[in-house]
């Protein structure tokens, strides 16, 4: 955009500030701890219940002082409008904090300026106290589909000399300034709080509460509301006034919503950068100024997405030196202009936005240059595509499991999981999922900051997960005899035979073989061989021929879970002494006792256990150790924390195998034991280890081995950031 038009847009905001009393220093309202953020996009619209599951699983990343959800790309029929209105009109969502404020807000800020095609109050629960996870009554929310009246927009353009500005861009700016006025009158940060704008943009919605994010789904009854992208935030403010929902994330810009995990060290500097451009923060949070920065560079400066990211997370040092020369010159200019407005400190953004001029929806994640906050990306390719971003992998796992229950074309195991490298010359510390129409269907492509596509495994043959033909599938006699032969040997023999055969087998062959192994595993030897072979199939890399590796892994994990669940419970008295394995779950936890006869392995089904506390699976494992158990298998994990903690010193004879989606702080403080993680691990892994052995057949998250004093550590995947401090 030409510099004189940029100046005019900035100057047009001056009158907004005429009656604003500026404090000498604009300070944040609250400090924030380690929040939880998650987002996903789908090539087909999917229901709000699928953002509920990862939000609930990240419940302990919030403290009930703020939760929020945003969505982009709706189904017009669900909103009671036409496709034309949905795509062309702004969706204006206003939170009403007092019962009698609606008429006044409409009279002063809506009907004088906008043509309203439709409006409606959002449905809500009859009694907010019946919805778990709410701390105060959420606001009533009214949704308006609006366009600026022609005569109003003409006057706005003339007054601000916007004749050379695209008319739709001028309308965007009017909408933005009108929302500022509404907020200033009805929700001044230090004054009365009656109403505020939740979101303003085309085909986008933001909802937020004082409480937890998952409560929004039930309170506003959006379980079945469908959209192409969803993001959520669990807030963890650590000080300040946090009893109003406006401070919760996401924060809005025109056509965008942003959530944030972290805390700026230079909030005042960033605010000054905005004030110099006549942009005044109203809600006094890091996340608000982040959204304002992004909106400024996107709409006013017309920066490309690459250059917006560079301004917010500048490339530096060796990475800068490795950039192409043409980028260095431009990046130097961007950094010189925006360095004082570049967020400093630990942060990770997830942004969803509508890009109407490209007929595109976007979901993107940006990490700070030092990667000081956890982040993970994933992509599930196929007939239905899913792109995912989260502050922890277990939230991504929860999303895919939820989606797959509704649509079996979606595999619970993604094709690829990866991390961004902040401020790097390789990926720029950001990845973008673009959802746009291709040959009449919505499809997703994923690129890094520089526009380089993310490489995915070569497309393979998908498994029909709902097919049950494998249940009656007749294996040829050679396969059947080999399975019987190798099942009686070491698990390595069995694994090698299956591994070498997978490329030539059909999916039905593979599933029937897995099932046969489980069904024939009756005694300790057979069960151990099956668990060992399945674990290696889950952990190791091997050729799968024309099949999808992610589908093979899902089938293995499904069968392994079936095997674990088939084991006898602790209180099952009908099994003989030939089986060393005993099962316990949440419902049977009161039957915990010490090992009897030849029992030696306690198998804990962690599903449905709380993630932490006295009733957690980690606490159960500790109690079991005190009663004499030394070998453990933990499966069905959905983010449970502290596995292996609290067992005390000299635990050399303790062995723990962990499957599925374990949570933070696993193996922290161990002294001698062996823990094997048969999947990716999470954050705060292995802190203050004294002695022992830790094996991870996947990636590890942030703050890996903080304060560790010893031990043997093996990681097959990568370490996302800040290990070994």
Question: Which residues fall in each region the model found?
Answer:
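Conserved short alpha-helical segments that host acidic/polar catalytic motifs at enzyme active sites
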Residues: 1-478
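Long, distal/terminal scaffolding or interaction modules
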Residues: 467-725
């Amino acid at each position: 955009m030409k510099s004189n038009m940029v100046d005019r847009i900035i100057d047009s905001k001056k009158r907004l500030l005429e009656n604003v009393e500026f404090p000498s220093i604009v300070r944040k309202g609250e400090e924030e701890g380690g929040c939880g953020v998650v987002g996903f996009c789908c090539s087909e619209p999917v229901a709000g219940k699928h953002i509920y599951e990862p939000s609930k699983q990240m419940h302990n990343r919030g403290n009930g002082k703020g939760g929020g959800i945003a969505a982009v790309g709706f189904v017009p029929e669900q909103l009671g409008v036409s496709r034309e209105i949905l795509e062309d009109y702004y969706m204006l969502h206003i939170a009403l904090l007092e019962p009698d404020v609606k008429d006044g807000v409409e009279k002063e800020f809506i009907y004088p300026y906008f043509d309203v095609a439709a409006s409606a109050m959002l449905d809500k629960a009859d009694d907010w106290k019946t919805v778990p996870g709410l701390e105060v009554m959420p606001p009533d929310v009214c949704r308006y589909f609006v366009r600026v009246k022609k005569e109003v927009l003409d006057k706005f353009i003339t007054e601000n000399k916007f004749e050379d500005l695209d008319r739709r861009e001028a309308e965007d700016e009017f909408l933005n300034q009108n929302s500022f006025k509404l907020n200033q009158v009805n929700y001044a940060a230090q004054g009365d709080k009656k109403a505020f704008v939740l979101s303003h943009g085309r085909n986008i919605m933001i909802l937020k509460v004082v409480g937890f994010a998952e409560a929004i789904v039930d309170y506003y009854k959006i379980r079945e509301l469908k959209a192409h992208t969803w993001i959520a935030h669990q807030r963890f403010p650590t000080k300040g006034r946090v009893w109003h929902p406006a401070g919760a994330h996401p924060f809005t810009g025109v056509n965008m919503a942003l959530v944030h995990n972290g805390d700026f060290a230079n909030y005042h500097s960033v605010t000054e950068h905005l004030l110099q451009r006549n942009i005044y923060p109203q809600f006094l949070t890091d996340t608000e100024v982040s959204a304002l920065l992004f909106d400024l560079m996107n709409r006013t400066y017309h920066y490309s997405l690459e250059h917006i990211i560079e301004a917010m997370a500048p490339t530096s040092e060796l990475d800068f030196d490795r950039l192409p020369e043409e980028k260095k010159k431009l990046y130097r200019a961007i950094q010189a202009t925006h360095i004082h407005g570049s967020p400093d400190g630990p942060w990770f953004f997830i942004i969803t936005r509508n890009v109407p001029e490209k007929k595109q929806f976007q979901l993107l994640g940006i990490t700070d240059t030092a990667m000081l906050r956890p982040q993970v990306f994933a992509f599930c390719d196929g007939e239905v595509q899913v792109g995912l971003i989260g502050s922890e992998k277990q939230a991504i796992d929860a999303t895919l499991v939820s989606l797959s229950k509704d649509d079996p074309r979606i595999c619970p195991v993604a094709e690829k999981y990866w991390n961004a490298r902040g401020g790097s010359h390789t990926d720029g510390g950001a990845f973008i999922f673009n959802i746009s129409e291709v040959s009449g269907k919505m499809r997703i492509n994923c690129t890094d900051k520089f526009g380089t596509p993310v490489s995915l495994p070569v497309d393979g043959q998908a498994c029909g997960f709902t097919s049950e033909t494998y249940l009656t599938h007749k294996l040829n006699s050679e396969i059947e005899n080999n399975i019987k032969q190798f099942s009686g040997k070491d698990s390595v023999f069995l694994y090698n035979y299956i591994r070498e055969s997978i490329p030539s087998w059909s999916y039905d062959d593979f599933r029937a073989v897995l099932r046969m192994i489980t069904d024939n595993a009756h005694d300790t030897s057979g069960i151990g061989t099956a668990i060992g072979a399945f674990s290696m199939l889950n952990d190791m890399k091997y050729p799968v021929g024309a099949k999808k590796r992610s589908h093979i892994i899902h089938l293995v994990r499904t069968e392994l879970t079936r095997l674990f669940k088939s084991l006898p419970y602790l209180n099952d008295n009908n099994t003989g002494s030939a089986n060393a394995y005993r099962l316990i779950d949440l419902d049977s936890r009161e039957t915990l006792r010490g090992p009897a006869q030849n029992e030696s392995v306690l198998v804990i089904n962690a599903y449905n256990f709380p993630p932490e506390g006295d009733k957690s699976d980690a606490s159960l494992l500790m109690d079991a150790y005190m009663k004499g158990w030394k070998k453990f298998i933990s499966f069905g994990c959905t983010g449970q924390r502290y596995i292996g903690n609290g067992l005390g010193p000299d635990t050399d004879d303790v062995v723990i195998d962990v499957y599925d989606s374990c949570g933070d702080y696993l193996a922290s403080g161990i002294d001698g034991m062996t823990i094997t993680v048969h999947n990716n691990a999470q954050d705060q892994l292995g802190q203050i280890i004294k002695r022992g052995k830790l094996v991870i057949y996947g990636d590890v998250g942030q703050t890996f081995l903080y304060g560790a004093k010893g031990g043997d550590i093996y990681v097959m995947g990568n370490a996302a950031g800040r290990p070994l401090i």
